[in-house]
Amino acid sequence: MTITSKLKKRRSLSTLITKIIILVLAPIILGIFVQSYYFSKQIIWQEVDRTKQQTSALILNIFESHFAAIQIHHDSNSKSDVILDFYSERNEEALNYFFLSIDQSDPSHTPEFRFLTDHQGIIWDDGNAHFYGINDSMLDGLTSKVTFSNNWYYVTSITSMGARHLLLRRVPVLEPKTGEVMGYSYNAVVLDNNFALMEKLKNEGNVDNVVLVANDIPVASSLAGDESYKIFDVLKRKETQKKLDQLLIIQTPIEVNAAITNLKLLTVQDNQSVVTLQIQHFLAMLASVIGMIMIALMTKEWIENRVVEELGSLMSYTRSAREEKGFERFGGSDIEEFDHIGSTLESTFEELEAQKRSFRDLFNFALSPIMVWSEAGVLIQINPAARKELVIENDIETMHPVFKGFKDKLVPHLRMAAQGATLTGVNVPIGDKVFRWNLSPIRVDGDISGIIVQGQDITTLIEAEKQSNLARREAEKSAQARADFLAKMSHEIRTPINGILGVAQLLKDSVEAEEQKNQIDVLRHSGEHLLAVLNDILDFSKIEQGKFNIQKHPFSFADTMRTLENIYRPICENKGVELVIENQLDGNVEIFTDQVRLNQILFNLVSNAVKFTPSGCVRLHAELEQFYGADNSVLVVEISDTGIGIESDKLDEMFEPFVQEEATTTREYGGSGLGLTIVKNLVDMLDGDVQVRSQKGQGTTFVVTLPVKDRERVLAPLDSSQRVKPAELFDESLKVLLVEDNHTNAFILKAFCTKYKMQVDWAKDGLEAMEFLKDHSYDLILMDNQLPHLGGIETTKEIRQNLKLGTPIYACTADTAQETSDAFMEAGANYVLLKPIKENALHEAFVDFKQRFLIERT
């Protein structure tokens, strides 16, 4: 775009004032004329419409009156003695004379032709039908088209002379004495070229001409041929009265016997007076426009003589300010408005000069480097701070290596800013320092005239960020090492716990003395307590790493309450503590949330309540709050006890990790101090809330609220196989391959399997298991995870992919991470058991195996 094209054409003040006058007066004058023209046009059109309606009604009335008169004569003639005698005597001469005398007495209401019929056919006609090309057979055919009533019928007949449009009616000829129908009298009016009818309509309707059309084809008209228009013009202009024309065409549809026909009467009237009035309106508007232009020109001349001189001095003052010749005072003007403008401009120029000085000071004394670049990447202006950093002492020393290297790195960003982008946080070094630059395009009248670049020294910040990233990576490495350590410790601790709990279960089944059973229970409870502490530590570690998974599904809350009661009622009875469970939920209601995490929350809270209540009562109250219109219900569980209670100033700390009320509490009651922390985090993950109330020595109450979805469920009866004894679960002895590297775990699992009449082969690692499977077939494979040589997951893949075996594989792992279970299932396992393996969990696994594989097989 050239500079010339950017400049707009300037106009003088007189021209602008003239335009203003025109713009003000023109709408007013034009508005008046347009409004006048509009209302006049509306009145004219209303008058035209009224004229059209009146003319149409008059023409239709004349047309109907004409045929009504013919109908009256026809009805009267049919009762004449001459016609009655003709039916008996057939005296045609008398009949012809009768009709001739009638036609001569009233020729204006005479039909074009007549004929009489009896029950055999036509017995007489006046012979006029042949003049219209209608022969005897056509005449006979017309009788079949008029079969009902005495009304007129519109009939079109194709003759040798072309189409003929007729109005035809009949009346019965009755024998006066008996009333018998002797025959019918027919009258026919031919509309084609019926000049007499058209003249009658023209004269009586007071119109210039009349045209009768059928299907937009002219049938008859009153045009004499000396008019300035033809029938074609009338047809072309009918119903096209959107603009006023010299001819006013009125269209009148013809109804015959209450039925719409294709006949229409077009009347023509002279409309010259209305057209003349319209032309006069246009001429008046044109005259007003010419007058307005003349006034504008005279006004312009007067303004130029009166105002231009004073305006010239004002323009001269503004030009001097634009040319930056220095600040000057305005000399004043005789015109008050111009003097005010000049004084205002003087104040404005003075303020602008002060702002320029302030900007120069800000630019020159700023501690941060500031530069102005052109769109082409040429340095336009630079402040002293930037000169110092870039080692530029004067404008010609821009080839210094420091500046050259800086410019090479900055140019790509300058190009982006030249396209209109605003760039922030661009790091470009100068020597050993790192500066963060902001680049912003300078826009003038929508076009980019330059780019301002501002920098900030962030060398110290960059170094601090490096140290922070290094510390973060070290912390992540430490957290990962701790997670790996906990995972390994989980496996190493769970393995001996598995042996302790497994042997305790086996011993309890093999002894009969009550004292020995109690001792074994102590051993088992101690192992389970150790396992609970380990689980708390592992769960807390997962929460810290964000690896705790929430998996929601529908389940029966009543089943959860039943399980909780079965576990803690015996414990409460042994302590002499009353356990009260109040479940207000309907037994047929399922709730939708994470069952495992809900169990963990409730078991932790009930376990704490039982643990810290030496005597008294532990109460659990559950109810479901439902709100109208809400998507979710709210499960409210309140767990209260009459235990030792908590000091009020310690309540806020109870959900912190490794916190108990006092150090002696841990020694007296045990625990990891993580239970409430895990509860708080699980409740938050389920979008719920947990509150605590307590008084020292009086007890504690925890209230858990969780949003859940609820629905009715159909309770299915428990499968009988879940209630049978181990030895009766399977109908035949099953062959099981146990893959386990730990002798203790293998011993316990083999002992459990023996109760189910299973034959167990023991493989100590994955490679040995592969050899067993090549030589033998098995009903079930129990697969450990951490095996020497070939791990459990890898062994499972080998069995599925290389050996192509579909033998059910039930994995046994001490790793509680969800990733491990998912990896086993992805490799081809059918079930995952967590160590330490309890007898009930193993029983459920065997029930699952029977239902999924043995029942399907049979």
UniProtKB/Swiss-Prot annotation:
Signal sequence coordinates: none
Keyword terms = ATP-binding, Cell inner membrane, Cell membrane, Hydrolase, Kinase, Membrane, Nucleotide-binding, Phosphoprotein, Protein phosphatase, Transferase, Transmembrane, Transmembrane helix, Two-component regulatory system
What are its GO cellular component terms? plasma membrane
Listed transmembrane segments = 14-34, 362-382
The record's InterPro entries line, in alphabetical order, gives: AI-2_sensor_kinase/phosphatase (IPR053413), CheY-like_superfamily (IPR011006), HATPase_C_sf (IPR036890), His_kinase_dom (IPR005467), HisK_dim/P_dom (IPR003661), HisK_dim/P_sf (IPR036097), LuxQ-periplasm_dom (IPR015387), LuxQ-periplasm_N (IPR043056)
The segment(s) forming the Response regulatory domain are 735-850
Q: How does it sit in the membrane?
A: Multi-pass membrane protein
Quaternary state and partners of this protein?
A: Binds the complex formed by the autoinducer and LuxP.
Q: What is this protein called?
A: Autoinducer 2 sensor kinase/phosphatase LuxQ
Record organism: Vibrio parahaemolyticus serotype O3:K6 (strain RIMD 2210633)
Task: State the encoding gene.
Answer: luxQ
